[in-house]
Amino acid sequence: TTLGRGGSDFTAALLAEALDAESCEIWTDVTGVYTTDPRITPAAHPLPELSFEEAAEMATFGAKVLHPATMEPALRKDIKVFVGSSKEPEKGGTWIVRDCEHEPPYRAITRRKEQVMVTVKTPKMMYAQGFLQQVFAIIAKHKLSVDLVTTSEISVSFTLDNPANSVAQRLNKETIAELETICDVKVEKGYDLVTVVGNNMQTAIGVSSKILSAVSDFNLRMICFGANPHNLSFLVNETDSD
């Protein structure tokens, strides 16, 4: 297809939706959706079952086994999705379904490389109305897509995905100059975005403390947890993400 990597997955899900299919099977070169990248972590293993939301979060935040949009048509028609290996079909795979709860609540880890962190800062933000709207209007004008966002009294930090320096090409002097008409701007590169994906992570006691204590030896930036019950994300220096 013309949809890029994983586009055939999305096409299959759209066809399943159009045909009112009960299930959609996606055959790849891996035996299901893994807990993390097995090339980095030998202990990684396929998950027997995932919810639509968990799979969508994993695809969005770096898991390459599925196209991020694949879950949309499946979710609309409640179509079960199976992911397995065409080379080793006897090994089974992962079923992706509407409702799925497993222990522990954190179930997988993804990584998205080449992230850019932008921090905009001005004392005027404390009392000004519409400041964020101005900032994100400039970002949208230059066709930049924001992922994580954190705020303080006088500053806002946000991340931009930067595959093959595509963001660097658009986050140019013109963009920064326009932002600097309303605030100070700091651009930092060399980060990877790590996301822990699971279910009911907001309500499970001690989940965030366990995750953060496991990475306490590393300098984390932009810890984001709470907007979605299925993930906790943070930036880490690209030299530490493995």
Where are these regions (language model features)?
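C-terminal catalytic "cap/lid" subdomain
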Residues: 1-242
